[in-house]
A protein has these predicted regions:
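Active-site nucleophile/metal-coordination loop of metallo-enzymes that catalyze phosphate/sulfate
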Residues: 2-21, 29-142
């Protein structure tokens, strides 16, 4: 008997519980040809194995095609009009200042990772972009 649900609902969508541990790698702003060339030259053997033995997809981006809206659409399963992060920055009309949208208060939708964590999955979020740390980790204890 399984100790987890067969699927998890997040933002109105059902996600099946993975049959095996799952890793999602998002290479933001990377032209697929760069990865293919690195693999062909033997410079990325681990990526070659992941692509050969796992699954890989060239993602379709959302508009606007900036880091924050796209990454958050991937992890929420919803467009910027729903998750609330429509750019990397916005202009604050009260101050006339540009505000970086890197604070979790701007995110209006739960992440798929949070949905699975709430259902009992062990979840980790790793990013080298400080601006994404709070957004991707919203609702987690790390």
């Amino acid at each position: 008997m399984s100790d987890h649900p067969p699927e998890v609902m997040v933002n109105g969508r059902a996600y099946r519980w993975p049959a095996a541990p799952t890793v999602v790698i998002c290479l933001d702003g990377s032209e697929p040809g760069y990865i293919e060339t690195a693999i062909d030259k033997g410079l990325a053997p681990h990526l070659a194995r992941l692509m050969r033995e796992g699954a890989n997809f060239a993602a379709l981006s959302v508009i606007p095609s900036f880091t924050n809206p796209n990454n958050l659409s991937i992890v929420t399963g919803r467009p910027p009009s729903v998750h609330g992060v429509a750019g990397n920055y916005f202009l604050d009309p009260a101050t006339g200042e540009e505000v970086m949208m890197n604070d979790a208060r701007f995110l209006r939708a739960d992440t798929i990772m949070k949905g699975f964590a709430d259902a009992g999955a062990r979840v980790a979020v790793v990013t080298d972009k400080d601006k994404l740390r709070a957004l991707l980790g919203k609702g987690h204890d790390f």
